[in-house]
């Protein structure tokens, strides 16, 4: 007998709550439709639901996000890197204490080799027709960062293979909730064809009709709640097999309904968060300014805080990381979150004088200062002018109309080509293609769990 099963999935919401009332309304409507047709519906979130750029998430350390998932009555969730590495250890350990759904992640452990109390390596769901589905889950293994936060994360592919051996005889269908990114998910599909469907995330791909790799269906719904994905599986309950599987997405911009209850809940959470973040951390005698394309007070203050916190020779901060000024008077946690919402940590690296000079020259180029940045934890608009503490950078605009770095000195002396210098930077400089010499530095020390705004609060309070 042929029957239909639907898996609705969200991924990488990043606390863009403006779309959540639509998502709730859409899924609730679809549940009712399928229920009236006698068809089963399951709902999953594939991680990075939370993002501390949003002040409600900041104030609750993500517990408001879990409340939203509870209220939607989802059937399971994976965790993303925003859940995994942007929360202090004790906050992640307690994040899902009140979750009313299984949190499925097989490759995360504490330092004693135990899973978090809320984690399961897989979840088996029995369907009304007698068939069963095994749901597996993995998260992207940022090894040094998890280690710094007191966790152990293991190789995702090996973990999947181990879990497959456990569930193979227990389930008719195998679905992987993966927060690895599309390239890794394609590799998983090639290596583990026993998987029927991968609900994927992390790299924010929109797979409007899914993608089939080695017989495995990959499905992903982009980011920020712009879309909700749906995998439709037609099964033969007598043969206990899959007849067909397809993927589609619903654009939330085209969905007009909204959940009034969800909007009211979010409004209440915003009021609570504003009150919780209203504590003053410092008092300013006068306004503190920021200018993205010239040296200004707040980025410089952060540069000095970074150098002092990391105990380095030098620090470098892009002015665009500060999103606005601070007014004279009390400075609250909410004020600092408003001007520096990024989930970005300090990092200390070691560079030779030659590498440092090349990096500074690169940062001073108009192309870098004007660069629009997306991702890497950055929640602003533009890179902006690089400012420094501990090193003096002299520049001059020459006849070619380009600003050139003419001299770099440390304590009045030219930096030495082969000497090693410790440099405090933003962790986003160690990722991607922004600063290859920083990214490829052999020595890196991450300072966690503090974010840049925590360093600003510490420095302002001095």
UniProtKB/Swiss-Prot annotation:
GO terms for cellular component: outer membrane-bounded periplasmic space. It holds the Pfam family 5_nucleotid_C. GO terms for molecular function: 5'-nucleotidase activity; metal ion binding; UDP-sugar diphosphatase activity. Binds 2 divalent metal cations. Residues 258-291 form a coiled coil. Its cofactor is a divalent metal cation. InterPro entries: 5'-Nucleotdase_C (IPR008334), 5'-Nucleotdase_C_sf (IPR036907), 5_nucleotidase/apyrase (IPR006179), Metallo-depent_PP-like (IPR029052), Pesterase_YunD (IPR011240). A divalent metal cation 2 binds at residues 48, 81, 179, 202. The keyword Metal-binding applies. Keywords: Coiled coil, Hydrolase, Metal-binding. Belongs to the metallophosphoesterase superfamily. This is Uncharacterized metallophosphoesterase YunD. It comes from Bacillus subtilis (strain 168). The lineage of its organism: Bacteria, Bacillati, Bacillota, Bacilli, Bacillales.
């Amino acid at each position: 007998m042929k029957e239909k099963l639907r898996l609705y999935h969200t991924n990488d919401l990043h606390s863009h709550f403006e779309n959540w009332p639509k998502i709730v309304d859409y899924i609730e409507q679809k549940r009712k439709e399928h229920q009236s047709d006698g068809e089963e519906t399951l709902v999953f979130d594939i991680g990075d639901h939370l993002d501390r750029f949003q002040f409600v998430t900041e104030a609750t350390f993500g517990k408001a996000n879990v409340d939203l998932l509870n209220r939607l009555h989802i059937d399971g969730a994976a965790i993303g890197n925003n859940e995994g590495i942007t929360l202090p250890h004790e906050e992640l350990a307690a994040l899902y204490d009140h979750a009313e759904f299984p949190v499925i992640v097989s490759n995360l452990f504490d330092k004693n080799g135990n899973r978090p109390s809320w984690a399961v390596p897989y979840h088996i769901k029995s369907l009304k027709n007698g068939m069963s589905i095994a749901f597996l889950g993995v998260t992207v293994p940022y090894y040094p960062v998890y280690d710094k936060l007191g966790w152990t994360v293991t190789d995702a592919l090996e973990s999947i293979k181990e879990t497959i051996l456990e569930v193979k005889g227990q389930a008719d269908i195998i679905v992987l909730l993966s927060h690895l990114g599309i390239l890794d998910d394609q590799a998983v599909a090639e290596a583990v064809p026993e998987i029927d469907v991968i609900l994927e995330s992390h790299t924010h791909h929109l797979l409007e009709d899914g993608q089939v790799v080695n017989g495995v269906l990959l499905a992903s719904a982009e980011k920020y709640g712009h879309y909700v994905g749906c995998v439709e599986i037609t099964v033969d309950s007598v043969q206990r097999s899959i007849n067909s599987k397809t993927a589609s997405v619903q654009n939330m911009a085209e969905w007009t309904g909204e959940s009034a209850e969800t909007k009211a809940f979010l409004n209440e959470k915003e009021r609570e968060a504003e009150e919780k973040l209203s504590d003053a951390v410092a008092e300013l005698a006068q306004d503190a300014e920021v200018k993205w394309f010239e040296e200004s007070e707040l980025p410089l203050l952060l540069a000095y805080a970074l150098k002092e916190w990391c105990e380095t020779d030098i620090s470098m901060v892009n002015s665009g990381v500060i999103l606005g000024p601070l007014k004279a008077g009390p400075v609250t946690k909410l004020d600092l979150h408003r001007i520096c919402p990024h989930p970005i940590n300090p990092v200390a690296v070691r560079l030779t004088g030659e590498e440092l000079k090349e990096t500074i020259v690169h940062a001073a180029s108009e192309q870098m200062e004007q660069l629009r940045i997306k991702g890497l934890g950055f929640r602003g608009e533009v890179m902006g002018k690089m400012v420094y503490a501990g090193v003096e950078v002299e520049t001059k605009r020459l006849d070619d109309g380009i600003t050139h770095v003419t001299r770099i000195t440390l304590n009045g002396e030219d930096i030495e080509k082969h000497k090693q210098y410790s440099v405090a930077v933003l962790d986003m400089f160690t990722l991607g293609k922004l600063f290859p010499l920083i990214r490829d530095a052999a020595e890196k020390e991450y300072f966690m769990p503090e974010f840049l705004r925590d360093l600003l609060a510490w420095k302002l309070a001095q």
